[in-house]
Structures are given as structure tokens and as C-alpha cells.
Amino acid sequence: MSIFFTSFYILILFIIGFFLIIVYNNIWKSGVNMGLTLDVVERISDIKNEPLWMREFRKRSYEYFINSSDPNFGPKLDIDYDNITYYKERESKLTNKWENVNSKVKDVFDDLGVIKNEKKYFDGVGAQFDSEVIYHNMIEELTKKNVIFLDTDTALAKYPELFKKYFNKLVKYNENKFTALNGAVWSGGTFIYVPPFTKLDRPLQSYFRINSKNMGQFERTIIAIDEGSEVHYIEGCTAPTYTSDALHAAVVEIFVEKNAKMRYTTIQNWSSDVY
């Protein structure tokens, strides 16, 4: 009888353990966890399968964040950092074809008219939904000219040396609490490189949407315009109104070489509950 109960007890523990693993994985998948810990930072790096140097950069940024005070410039902010979700996995796979975007996500952007006039007015368009970019596309003519217009995560994987040349060079992670926060949990954003003496006739555009309550969005945008080149980049940001706060803390680094021209336009239409 004791052997039976021992076996039954072990079986129950196994079932409970298996259930907890499923719950844990689903929590990360849905992104419902709140609060920032080193485990959260490392989990983001794991999900993105990043190189070691980026993982260590995130950890340094996290340490600076938890040991620093809010900046002494601007209005006093009453942010509850424990009530923010710092990362949410993509709800639609990254694609360069709008028809392949998840219908739920597509409906949100279609209502805003983000993609409707892409071919008519823009040389390239990107769209980010919460933590991840879900759509990125550029006309083939610019690809032939070696222009790079990618989401930042893809640029890190595809052009690691070019990425490292510009990343964290203008805006250091230890400038203030919010640059450190971005360094720890950055996700998504736009990476643009325009080679020498290349002129883009129409703008590139990216659109950033916070669509979940208590969500933090931390995109990282890098724009490098080489000698004698010209580009106009337009960035749009918005979020619906919820009864709880959200947080947007992005970093933008722009490099403009000799005789180059760069026009950067940002249109931010945040709801009143977004810090």
C-alpha cells in the first residue's frame, strides 16, 4: 500500500510540475508578466537569440537602471515600473506582404490608414505592434542601390558589424534612467543605412502602435546617412486610451555624414495615459 501511495504522490508532483511549466511558458508567450527583473531582461535576449555582446549590454543597462534616479529635467513622473509589461511576443509573423499580416493586427492598422497609401507616397514602410515589428517593406529599386531599411532586430542579425558601428554611439545607455531602461529591454524599431551619393525621392515611414494596457514600448531606431545622400524619414506613434498607464521610452540615433541631408519627422498622438 505504501508503494502505491508513494508512486501516486510522485505522479501528482510530476503533473503539477508539468502544469506549472505550461503556465510559465504561456505567461511569457502572452506577455502578461509585469515588472522588470534581470530574468525578464535575459528572457528577452533568449527569445531574440541575440549575440553575447548584446545580452551583456542589456544586463549593464539593467544594472544602471535599477541604481539610478529619475532625471532631474522635465516634469516629475509618477511611473509605477512594477505595473508595466516590458515585452510581448509578436501577434503576427514579420512579413513584407501586407496580406500575410494577422487579421486582428491588420484591422487596427487599416483603420488608421497606415498602409493604404504606401505605394503612392513612400519608398518603404514599417509597422510595429507593441514590442515587435510585424511588417517591413521597401521598393526593389532601393534594394538594388544597397539601401538598408529593416526592423532593428533583423538588422542586428543580418548586418552585425554595421549595426555595432552605430549602436549606442550617440545615445549612451548610462545617460539617464530612461536610456538605461531602453538599453535593457529594447525591442523593434527601424534601422536605415543609405550608402554614399544615394538620394531617396520619397520618404521612408515607420509606425509604432501600443495596443495593450499597461504596455511598455521600447523601440530602437538607428539612421545612418552616408556622404552626399538624402533621405526623409517619417515616424508615427499612437495608442488607444485605457484606464491604466502605458510607457513609451524609445531611443533614436541619427548619423549624417558630409554633404548629406536627413529630414526626420515624428508625429506622436499618444493617449493621455501614456508616459
Identify what each model region corresponds to.
Residues 1-3, 65:
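Charge-dense, intrinsically disordered terminal/linker segments
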Residues 6-7, 159:
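Polar helix-capping/helix-linker motif
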Residues 3, 9-10, 18-26:
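Short, positively charged and aromatic/hydrophobic N-terminal segments
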Residues 22-275:
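Glycine-rich and polybasic anion-binding loops at the starts of cofactor/ligand-binding domains
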